[in-house]
Amino acid sequence: MERTLFAATALLIATAAVSTAQEANAPEQAPPGDPFVQVSDALPLPEFIPGLGTLFVDPATLPAGPFLAYDHDGKLSATVYMTPLEELQNGTAYDDLATASDTVTGVDIYYNAGHPGVDKPHAHVVLFHDPDAKARLAK
Protein backbone atom coordinates (compact mmCIF):
# COMPACT_ATOMS: atom_id res chain seq x y z
CA MET A 1 0.00 0.00 0.00
CA GLU A 2 2.81 2.44 0.86
CA ARG A 3 4.55 1.67 -2.44
CA THR A 4 1.33 2.52 -4.25
CA LEU A 5 1.12 5.81 -2.37
CA PHE A 6 4.69 6.74 -3.22
CA ALA A 7 4.15 5.74 -6.85
CA ALA A 8 1.05 7.93 -6.99
CA THR A 9 3.00 10.84 -5.51
CA ALA A 10 5.78 10.34 -8.06
CA LEU A 11 3.19 10.42 -10.82
CA LEU A 12 1.81 13.62 -9.35
CA ILE A 13 5.23 15.23 -9.67
CA ALA A 14 5.68 13.98 -13.21
CA THR A 15 2.25 15.32 -14.15
CA ALA A 16 3.07 18.68 -12.61
CA ALA A 17 6.32 18.88 -14.53
CA VAL A 18 4.64 18.00 -17.83
CA SER A 19 1.77 20.43 -17.32
CA THR A 20 4.09 23.34 -16.54
CA ALA A 21 4.18 24.50 -20.15
CA GLN A 22 0.37 24.70 -20.16
CA GLU A 23 0.06 26.92 -17.11
CA ALA A 24 0.51 30.64 -16.60
CA ASN A 25 3.22 31.65 -14.17
CA ALA A 26 2.38 33.22 -10.82
CA PRO A 27 3.61 36.71 -9.96
CA GLU A 28 7.23 36.70 -8.81
CA GLN A 29 6.35 39.02 -5.88
CA ALA A 30 3.67 38.54 -3.24
CA PRO A 31 0.78 39.01 -3.08
CA PRO A 32 -0.36 37.20 -6.22
CA GLY A 33 -3.84 38.81 -6.36
CA ASP A 34 -7.25 37.30 -7.11
CA PRO A 35 -8.33 34.53 -6.89
CA PHE A 36 -5.54 33.75 -4.40
CA VAL A 37 -5.96 34.40 -0.68
CA GLN A 38 -3.27 34.39 1.96
CA VAL A 39 -3.66 31.16 3.91
CA SER A 40 -2.91 32.84 7.27
CA ASP A 41 -5.81 35.27 6.70
CA ALA A 42 -8.27 32.41 6.20
CA LEU A 43 -6.98 29.80 8.67
CA PRO A 44 -5.41 29.76 12.14
CA LEU A 45 -1.87 29.37 10.75
CA PRO A 46 1.16 31.65 11.06
CA GLU A 47 1.86 34.15 8.27
CA PHE A 48 5.22 32.47 7.55
CA ILE A 49 5.49 28.70 8.00
CA PRO A 50 9.12 27.54 8.30
CA GLY A 51 9.87 25.20 5.41
CA LEU A 52 6.91 26.43 3.36
CA GLY A 53 6.97 30.23 3.56
CA THR A 54 4.03 32.60 3.21
CA LEU A 55 1.32 30.64 1.43
CA PHE A 56 -1.40 31.78 -0.97
CA VAL A 57 -4.06 29.52 -2.48
CA ASP A 58 -7.07 29.76 -4.76
CA PRO A 59 -9.80 28.28 -2.49
CA ALA A 60 -11.38 26.55 -5.51
CA THR A 61 -8.28 24.32 -5.81
CA LEU A 62 -8.37 22.91 -2.27
CA PRO A 63 -7.26 20.55 -0.89
CA ALA A 64 -4.44 19.87 -3.36
CA GLY A 65 -3.60 23.40 -4.41
CA PRO A 66 -1.31 24.67 -5.84
CA PHE A 67 -0.23 26.76 -2.88
CA LEU A 68 2.11 29.57 -3.92
CA ALA A 69 4.99 29.86 -1.44
CA TYR A 70 6.82 33.17 -1.00
CA ASP A 71 9.91 33.89 1.12
CA HIS A 72 10.28 36.66 3.76
CA ASP A 73 11.02 39.21 1.01
CA GLY A 74 7.91 38.24 -0.96
CA LYS A 75 9.83 36.36 -3.67
CA LEU A 76 8.08 33.38 -5.26
CA SER A 77 10.07 30.36 -4.08
CA ALA A 78 7.95 27.21 -4.39
CA THR A 79 4.74 25.57 -5.48
CA VAL A 80 3.23 23.30 -2.81
CA TYR A 81 0.60 20.59 -3.19
CA MET A 82 -1.17 18.94 -0.24
CA THR A 83 -2.65 15.63 -1.37
CA PRO A 84 -4.75 13.68 1.16
CA LEU A 85 -3.40 10.14 1.53
CA GLU A 86 -6.86 8.58 1.83
CA GLU A 87 -7.92 10.12 -1.48
CA LEU A 88 -4.76 8.85 -3.20
CA GLN A 89 -5.29 5.39 -1.74
CA ASN A 90 -8.88 5.44 -3.04
CA GLY A 91 -7.70 6.21 -6.54
CA THR A 92 -8.14 9.97 -6.75
CA ALA A 93 -5.89 11.49 -9.39
CA TYR A 94 -4.77 15.10 -9.28
CA ASP A 95 -4.23 15.79 -12.97
CA ASP A 96 -3.08 18.99 -14.63
CA LEU A 97 -2.18 20.79 -11.42
CA ALA A 98 -0.87 24.27 -12.11
CA THR A 99 2.69 25.25 -11.26
CA ALA A 100 3.77 28.71 -10.17
CA SER A 101 6.92 28.76 -12.31
CA ASP A 102 8.42 27.01 -15.32
CA THR A 103 11.62 26.45 -13.32
CA VAL A 104 11.87 23.59 -10.82
CA THR A 105 15.28 23.05 -9.23
CA GLY A 106 14.31 20.54 -6.54
CA VAL A 107 11.41 18.58 -5.07
CA ASP A 108 10.64 17.54 -1.49
CA ILE A 109 7.86 15.08 -0.57
CA TYR A 110 6.93 14.40 3.03
CA TYR A 111 4.12 13.23 5.28
CA ASN A 112 1.94 15.62 7.31
CA ALA A 113 -0.55 14.36 9.91
CA GLY A 114 -2.95 17.23 9.20
CA HIS A 115 -3.38 20.89 10.08
CA PRO A 116 -6.04 23.60 9.72
CA GLY A 117 -7.22 23.68 6.12
CA VAL A 118 -6.12 20.12 5.27
CA ASP A 119 -7.16 18.22 8.39
CA LYS A 120 -6.55 14.68 7.15
CA PRO A 121 -3.12 13.03 6.79
CA HIS A 122 -1.59 14.11 3.51
CA ALA A 123 1.61 14.40 1.52
CA HIS A 124 3.29 17.75 1.00
CA VAL A 125 4.85 17.95 -2.45
CA VAL A 126 7.09 21.01 -2.68
CA LEU A 127 8.56 22.18 -6.01
CA PHE A 128 11.37 24.68 -5.41
CA HIS A 129 11.84 27.31 -8.12
CA ASP A 130 15.48 28.31 -7.69
CA PRO A 131 18.60 26.81 -6.08
CA ASP A 132 18.34 28.98 -2.92
CA ALA A 133 14.58 28.69 -2.42
CA LYS A 134 14.66 25.88 0.15
CA ALA A 135 17.13 27.78 2.33
CA ARG A 136 15.07 30.99 2.14
CA LEU A 137 11.91 29.14 3.19
CA ALA A 138 13.61 27.24 6.02
CA LYS A 139 13.55 30.05 8.56
PLM-predicted stretches and their roles:
Residues 21-139:
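Metal-centered catalytic cores of metalloenzymes
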Residues 1, 11-12, 134-139:
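Contiguous hydrophobic segments
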